[in-house]
UniProtKB/Swiss-Prot annotation:
The keyword Signal applies. The modification Phenylalanine amide is found at residue 96. This is Dromyosuppressin. Belongs to the myosuppressin family. Myoinhibiting neuropeptide. GO terms for molecular function: neuropeptide hormone activity; neuropeptide receptor binding.
Length: 100
């Protein structure tokens, strides 16, 4: 087997592994499907509920971050007009020491 054949075989194996892992991740855990959860013990139901809540939290955080990013992009024109200099006065610089 030449190096080129070995390289192609390795690349093909990596692609197949990536595709199979992606499909498994998209399907989600089989134990937390709605028809099966009712038959599970209470502690498993709590775990499934926690997983569902974490998914909801993740989607809420993603939407919040996207909204904040879009607000920053919308305000970027104002920042560019002022050349990134601050216009509000919320601090004062005091200098102590000898006069020159």
């Amino acid at each position: 087997m030449s190096f080129a054949q070995f390289f192609v075989a390795c690349c093909l194996a990596i692609v197949l592994l990536a595709v199979s892992n992606t499909r498994a991740a998209v399907q989600g855990p089989p134990l937390c499907q709605s028809g099966i959860v009712e038959e599970m013990p209470p502690h498993i139901r709590k775990v499934c509920q926690a997983l569902e809540n974490s998914d909801q939290l993740t989607s809420a955080l993603k939407s919040y971050i996207n909204n904040e990013a879009s607000a920053l992009v919308a305000n970027s024109d104002d920042l560019l007009k002022n050349y990134n200099k601050r216009t509000d006065v919320d601090h004062v610089f005091l200098r102590f020491g000898k006069r020159r």
